[in-house]
Amino acid sequence: MPVIASRISPQSEAFKANAAHLLAQVEKFRSFERAVIAHSSQQAERFAKRGQLLPRERVARLLDHGAPFLELSTLAGFGMHDDDGASRVMGGGSIVGIGVVSGKRVLVLASDSAIKGGAISPMGLKKSLRAQEIAKENKLPLIYLVESGGANLLYQSEMFVEGGRF
């Protein structure tokens, strides 16, 4: 395959400015991802008192030790519904990703019961449906860890599953 010639100069000021801007945006994105984890982790003491693991701990115990986990749709519903995009970043109320269980690549979907009791928001539902599509398209087994209060009743009217999608 021939190499595609480029006229981009990594030493140019424009390139350096664009790279710096991009890295700043990536860090901003990563800070929102960390906020999702922090929001969920605030419930650690409550879960420990009940003898429960936090949802991310359950996912970690499910996966093969040391195997990679590619989390997907980390900011689903960002700035929507009860997610304010600042102090309450919820990631769609679930953890979705591709990992390895017993040596097999799988898609894991875990409701995050540390966020609103695992209640499903409209974007959380879309995140779950998209995870199911990804599993089907890639012939991945789907492991679903559920601990949920059901639909978030404030947004129940927005959560009708589109025809042929469930």
Where are the language model's segments positioned?
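Terminal-region recognition feature
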Residues: M1-F166
